[in-house]
Amino acid sequence: SEMCIRDRMINLEESLPREILRTNKSGAYHCTTIVDCNTRKYHGLLVIPVPNLDDENHVLLSSLDETVIQHGAEFNLGLHKYQGNHFSPNGHKYIREFDCEHIPATTYRVGGVILRKEKIFVHHENRILIRYTLVDAHSATTLRFRPFLAFRSVREYTHENSQASRDYQLVENGIKTCMYPGYPELFMQLNKKNEFHYEPNWYRGIEYPKEQERGYDFNEDLYVPGYFEVDIKKGESIIFSAGISEISPRRLKQTFEAEVADRTPRDSFYHCLKNSAHQFHNKQEEDHYILAGYPWFKCRARDMFVSLPGLTLAVDEIGEFEDVMETARKAINNYIKGEPIGCKIYEMDDPDVLLWAVWALQQYAKETSREQCRAKYGSLLEEIIDFIRQRKHDNLFLHENGLLYANGADRAITWMNSTVNGRPVIPRTGYIVEINALWYNALRFIADLVREGGNGLLADSLDAQAEVTGKSFVEVFRNEYGYLLDYVDGNMMDWSVRPNMIFTVAFDYSPLDRVQKKQVLDIVTKELLTPKGLRTLSPKSGGYNPNYVGPQIQRDYAYHQGTAWPWLMGFYMEAYLRIYKMSGISFVERQLIGLEDEMTSHCVGSLPELFDGNPPFKGRGAVSFAMNVAEILRILKLLSKYNL
């Protein structure tokens, strides 16, 4: 299978950039490289939220080093980076195969020993299970497991200190330990009787090259309480469990097998993305969120509404859409009333957020029916549109010309949100092109929806508003070259060629006629299209910077100045199919190949946040990004409708 990688494992330049991510619905995850060498401070075998400490994830178990012992000779399978490009103990040399079509599985060969290691992250609790199978051996074999503990937030590092507790208690077939107050106890158990040797030790100066690349601190010390030793026979499987509650060792085998049976294989582009889509769901008590990405993003309002249709409707999970919308609806209602949001959705006050919520509900209406959308969400849609028309939004001013004006001079208010020294890198302000495209689309969609529901008065009023808005949109944004200005504020017109003009070609309702739409599509195709997404700025525009590398400030300047983003390509493909219909299908399918190629690089089976805008278009940023996965899923679904 394409998910099986053999020859690249020995070469760390090939294997270290490839990461795997497994999550559960509570926000906990397991993330590392395919050779099990942690290269980010976010990496770990068991990383979990600790709500009584803060709103961050915490690395409890950083890694587990295995040693194969035969005839008194020890072969250590672990891998860590230390100072001066020094890797130790170089366990990757023994890897013969890595496969993650079903679950991440690594096969090691040490002399006559063949050992298979398979990892699974349990769906309904914070627990990782690792199954070791001795496929072949010619003499008595012992396994030794050495756990590296961190007990720290993903944003910080730990260093050798005297506060760390060295205490541990024996539990069935294992131990439990907790390094600091406020943390849950970590239970490490095997399904077979074993010896635990207490040998407390700090491993100093472990380095994370990805953090170094990004200009951050990059070294720490990890605590090893000792090691487990267990004999293993040819054909036998032993399971190691790490979790925050005790488990009966007798249950480990069946738990592992039940979890494996529950997984969708990553055997196609669609299945990879569908698996990835499930990873962004985050349930906390009654609330259901969508995380913007892994490993560092929380739930951001815009990202949630943009990605919701692709992550749920496009994989036929309408109930999941409704669950997330229930949480979002509470937040929207509180926001409209001027009360605290009351849940963990961030950036609710950005001016385009409510309009993206309308767009998400519009996709729901297309996937279910307008009647169902009206019955469930009609009042919410009317409240949103009324709130904006009554000029009650803090940063959306409805002008006489029907356009929405937003102030972004001092604060980044759109998805192009990078700031340096507190100032927006791109001060998009005034009439912003996608906000007004969203506005026109929302007016027309809600007008049609309420007219069908019998409210002709409101429908007429919204249509009249849309007429004014549409006319002004064309007058204000369209320039003599046939493309759209990115934003207009008084005499300030931004002529940069940016992807924000594509939305109005993609949306169901647009103020542009077909000729105007095609002109926009043409310039986007010529100047912004790459195999990995749309560039955020044309190479012909001033300030083009396609490489998202270096320390934070350098990256912030490049973030939306030429880097390519896959989610924009979703809207681009929708626009392309809107213009070319059936005859556009083969082009769109070819255009997806560049993203399908990503399934075996970066975060295996997912799409990273962004790419460099020039060849070789390297993946950058967060390893798995919700809007990207969602929009490509939405396009795959759209293509399947054309291909019926």
Give each language-model segment a name:
Residues N76-I103, V110-G112, Q390, D522-K532, ...:
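Non-catalytic C-terminal accessory modules of carbohydrate-active enzymes
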Residues H278-C299, K337-W356, A360, Y364-E367, ...:
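Carbohydrate-binding/catalytic loop surfaces
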Residues D136-A137, T158-N161, L170, I232-K234, ...:
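Aromatic-rich carbohydrate-recognition surfaces in CAZymes
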Residues F196-V230, W415-I432, K540-Y557:
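Glycine-rich phosphate/pyrophosphate-binding loop
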Residues H271, R389, H393-H399, Y440-D522, ...:
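Catalytic cores of carbohydrate-active enzymes
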Residues S1, R6-P265, F269, P295, ...:
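Terminal accessory carbohydrate-recognition/targeting modules of carbohydrate-active enzymes
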Residues R250, Y364-K376, F445-S461, V515, ...:
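Inter-helical turn/loop segments and adjacent helix faces that build the functional surface
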Residues N275-K283, E326-N334, D597-V604:
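Glycine-rich, acidic and aromatic/proline-enriched surface loops and short helix-turn segments
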